[in-house]
Amino acid sequence: MQKRTLGNSARELATIGLGCMGLSEFYGPPTEQAAAIKLLHEAIELGVDHFDTAEMYGMRSANESLLGEAFADRRDRVFIATKFGPTRDWETGMATGIDGSRENCRRAVEGSLQRLGTDVIDLYYLHRVDPATPIEDTVTAMAELVAEGKVRYIGLSEASGDTIRRAARIHPISAVQSEYSIFARDIEADVIPACLEVGASLVAYSPLGRGMLSGRFKNETLGENDWRSANPRFQGEAYAANVALVDEIEAVAAAKSCTPAQVALAWVIGRGEHVLTIPGTTKMENLKSNLGAYEVLLSAGEQTTLDALADRVMGDRYDESGMAIING
């Protein structure tokens, strides 16, 4: 199990963690509780120690509650990251805005601590930057939580390079979470240089392009309640073109006797020691297969082939409303 240091901390984590959102929402019906807990326990046994959740994942923060139950007797073996900022109407599930105020930060952390069944959150992110609250004010509030022992490290998610630098002047930023994959490389010009400058790890979410890079969408359609159906990269002409691009990833995988998903993950973790990643899955076989990416070493020629794909991807990585709240 490959380990890397979390940003400017002394904490070492498995390079490949587990994004837990899909266990509770967004990719179809929630996974049955017992099955979800079994998968989380198996992940620990396989050497995964970094688990990512958020207040907004699952109705009434069900994903945090799931992790709290799963890790109740295993807390010393796991590193839990959660996030605050986006707000939802829990009667309808609809998003209602972003609140990075001190008041919301303190309200949210107390709820997360309770649901997670812990007295300290290992890594606490601002999930999206609140345009109405100066980042300095939000990070000051988050730093108070560190001083009070409620949070160990703080991070930002989908923040711009300028915001990262401003935040780091207030308190060390240990991690920046952004979408990063063979198909999503827009952060390389601004966000990654800022991470390196302030000593933050890049935590890459959706390293498999929301499943597209696994190659399985050639034979599957999106299920009911799958939010990807509203994602521009999964619609119409763009969907067909993007799925066709995966052929080139599959060719690399065939030559290396591995899976396309393993190639995609190897590409991400091969970008540097500052990169951690949190692929999500609801299936035990995918969990085990993803960890096989540690054994995949890409040649310079393979890297060049894969690097060229991003410029040919069609569609934004979120719909218009989603694009409006990234790179804040």
Model region roles, listed by residue range:
Residues 187-223, 259:
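Aromatic-lined glycan-binding groove of carbohydrate-active enzymes
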Residues 9-27, 81-96, 120, 125:
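N-terminal small/glycine-rich loop or linker at the start of catalytic domains
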Residues 11-16, 47-49, 75-78, 118-122, ...:
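Short, well-ordered coil/turn segments that N-cap beta-strands
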Residues 21-23, 54-56, 83-87, 126-129, ...:
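Active-site beta-loop-alpha junctions enriched in small/polar residues
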Residues 6, 18, 36, 51, ...:
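Conserved, mostly hydrophobic/aromatic
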Residues 1, 197, 224-251, 255, ...:
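Terminal-tail/helix-coil boundary detector
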Residues 1-78, 315, 327:
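N-terminal binding-site loop/beta-alpha segment at the start of enzyme catalytic domains
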